[in-house]
């Protein structure tokens, strides 16, 4: 069996020699062309002219054949040159790994680190640190992400030239890994890993801190600090609540529609008020819609929505009914006015008001006016005001005004109690303006907190026997605070001529849990037994209702990570949302 051996050096030398031969032949052909392709006739007779033309035609044919031969020659030279390069590249690729291993072996054996090459990346979910890059050239490996509760791995460091590896992201509730240091002479520091999100708990789990950015070397920029993890939501407080749900009061009926004739569509009926404890007010009925197809000068108005019913103690008010919409098709000189949304019902003690109804939309009229949103219902004692309704929109037509959003309801005053004054309810949000034109409604004012009540006086016993004792109602438990967002990682230091990395942004605070509400006071105690014909004892005074549980405050946003020495400080995390107001508790035990 024979083997073919290719020597790139010999092939390249042969290609060079062939190129030289081609150049010599081309030069000779060019010199002969001037002498042979245009032979002059020796005399003016026909024979001399024919002989000169014959020699000239032979010379021109030779030049054409020489040009084709030169093109083939050039193709052969190019093929040999390309083949020589391909063989040389293949030999270099085959020799490269062995050569790099031979160069790295002494440094690896002596220092445990190669001279040239990139560090290995940490495996995901292990928190493994990234490997360091080569001492001379190489980037650090990226750190592996952490499992739940496990910090992310640190990024590997570079050597003399190279970039530091990025830190791995922290698992749930754990910190992100730090970015690797850049090359000593030149390179960029690795970015810190992001902190893990908080784990839910009684006080809301803290989000993990973002990893610090890696420092730069002599030239280069430090890495950015990682973003802190978001805190987890706090656990809701225990709320005794009612034993069985109470059916809401009856809703109002919708208004009658108006078709093809001018006028106003029927208005919606008002919702019924809640009468029992915990019974929500009924929603108001929607106003009737109006429409016409064709006609001249027809003016129509949508029906107004019905008002929402007031809620019973501890129950929200009903939502106001929406205003009726008006749609004109093919009408000339018509006027379309949307119905106004109705006011939401007021909330019962400790409950929010109902939302205002939305204004009716209009379309197709020559002049269009959308309906206004209704005002939100006022909150009961300690309850939040209801949001205002959205203003109606003008969907089509040449001229029109969108409706204004309704004002939010006022928050209720705080509950007066023996120990803690109730927190005023939050005013409702104003409704949005119309799609094209219209102003949003103003938000309702927050309710005033109640003044702390004085301690209750002791009950007087009956003449015959002692009066019945008053049981102390149990208030709702306090909700846990939302988790604090994780701190952003510090920005990495810069090189002498580089820039510092910016600190990572703080994580968002967790959402606070909802507070429980206090129970209703117990019934009065029975009079004592009569001894020696004494006067019957008076019934004991019913116990005061328990203080409503305070809604949990939203968790504080995580502080922004510190920047480098001259870097920008990271932005603070967003504050968590306030906890929702607790519902009314169970009745207290009788005295």
UniProtKB/Swiss-Prot annotation:
Residues 94-591 are annotated as: PGRS. Keywords: Host endoplasmic reticulum, Virulence. The keyword Transmembrane helix does not apply. Residues 1-93 form the PE domain. Residues 303-412, 468-491, 539-591 are annotated as: Disordered. The keyword Methyltransferase does not apply. InterPro entries: PE-PGRS_N, PGRS_rpt. It is found in: Host endoplasmic reticulum. Its main location: host cell. Interacts with human TLR4. The PGRS region is important for localization and function. Belongs to the mycobacterial PE family. PGRS subfamily. Involved in endoplasmic reticulum (ER) stress-mediated apoptosis through human Toll-like receptor 4 (TLR4) signaling pathway. Localizes to the host ER, leading to ER stress, disruption of intracellular Ca(2+) homeostasis and increase of nitric oxide (NO) and reactive oxygen species (ROS) levels. Stress response results in caspase-8 activation and apoptosis of macrophage cells. Apoptosis may lead to dissemination of the bacteria, thereby spreading the disease. This is PE-PGRS family protein PE_PGRS5. The gene is PE_PGRS5.
């Amino acid at each position: 069996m024979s083997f073919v051996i290719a020597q790139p050096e010999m092939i390249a030398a042969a290609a060079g020699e062939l190129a030289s031969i081609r150049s010599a032949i081309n030069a000779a052909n060019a010199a002969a062309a001037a002498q042979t392709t245009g032979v002059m006739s020796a005399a003016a007779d026909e024979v001399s002219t024919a002989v000169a033309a014959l020699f000239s035609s032979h010379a021109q044919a030779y030049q054409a054949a020489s040009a084709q031969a030169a093109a083939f020659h050039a193709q052969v030279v190019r093929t040999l040159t390309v083949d020589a390069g391909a063989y040389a590249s293949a030999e270099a690729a085959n020799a490269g790994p062995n050569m790099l291993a031979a160069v790295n072996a002494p440094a690896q054996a002596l220092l445990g680190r190669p001279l040239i090459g990139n560090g290995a990346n940490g495996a995901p979910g292990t928190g493994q640190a990234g490997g360091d890059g080569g001492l001379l050239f190489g980037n650090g490996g990226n750190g592996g992400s952490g499992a739940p509760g496990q910090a992310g791995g640190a990024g590997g460091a570079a050597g003399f030239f190279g970039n530091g590896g990025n830190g791995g992201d922290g698992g749930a509730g754990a910190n992100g890994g730090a970015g690797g240091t850049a090359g000593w002479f030149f390179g960029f520091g690795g970015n810190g890993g992001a902190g893990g999100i908080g784990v839910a708990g009684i006080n809301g789990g803290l989000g993990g801190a973002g990893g610090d950015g890696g420092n730069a070397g002599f030239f280069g920029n430090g890495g950015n600090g990682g973003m802190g993890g978001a805190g987890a939501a706090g656990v809701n407080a225990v709320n005794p609540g009612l034993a069985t749900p109470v059916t809401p009061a009856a809703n109002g009926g919708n208004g009658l529609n108006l078709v093809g004739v001018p006028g106003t569509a029927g208005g919606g009926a008002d919702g019924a008020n809640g009468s029992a404890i915990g019974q929500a007010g009924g929603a108001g009925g929607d106003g009737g819609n109006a429409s016409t197809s064709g006609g001249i000068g027809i003016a129509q108005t949508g029906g107004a929505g019905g008002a929402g019913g007031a809620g019973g103690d501890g129950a929200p008010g009903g939502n106001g009914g929406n205003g009726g919409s008006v749609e004109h098709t093919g009408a000339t000189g018509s006027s379309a006015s949307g119905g106004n949304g109705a006011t939401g019902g007021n909330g019962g003690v400790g409950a929010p008001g109902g939302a205002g109804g939305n204004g009716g939309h209009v379309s197709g009229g020559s002049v269009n006016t959308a309906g206004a949103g209704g005002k939100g219902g006022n909150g009961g004692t300690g309850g939040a005001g209801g949001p205002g309704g959205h203003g109606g929109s003008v969907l089509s037509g040449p001229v029109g005004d969108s409706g204004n959003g309704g004002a939010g309801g006022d928050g209720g005053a705080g509950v007066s109690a023996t120990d803690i004054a109730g927190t005023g309810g939050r005013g409702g949000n104003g409704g949005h303006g119309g799609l094209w034109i219209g102003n949003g409604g103003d938000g309702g004012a927050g309710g005033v907190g109640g003044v702390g009540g004085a301690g209750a006086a002791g009950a007087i016993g009956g003449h015959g026997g002692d009066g019945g004792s008053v049981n102390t109602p149990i208030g709702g438990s306090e909700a846990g605070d939302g988790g604090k967002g994780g701190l952003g990682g510090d920005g990495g230091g810069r090189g002498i001529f580089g820039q510092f990395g910016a600190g990572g942004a703080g994580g968002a605070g967790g959402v606070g849990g909802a507070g429980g509400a206090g129970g209703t006071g117990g019934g009065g105690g029975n009079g004592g037994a009569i001894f020696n014909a004494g006067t019957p004892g008076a019934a004991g005074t019913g116990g005061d209702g328990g203080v409503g549980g305070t809604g949990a405050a939203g968790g504080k946003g995580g502080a922004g990570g510190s920047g480098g020495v001259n870097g920008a400080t990271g932005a603070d995390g967003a504050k968590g949302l306030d906890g929702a107001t607790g519902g009314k508790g169970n009745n207290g035990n009788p005295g």
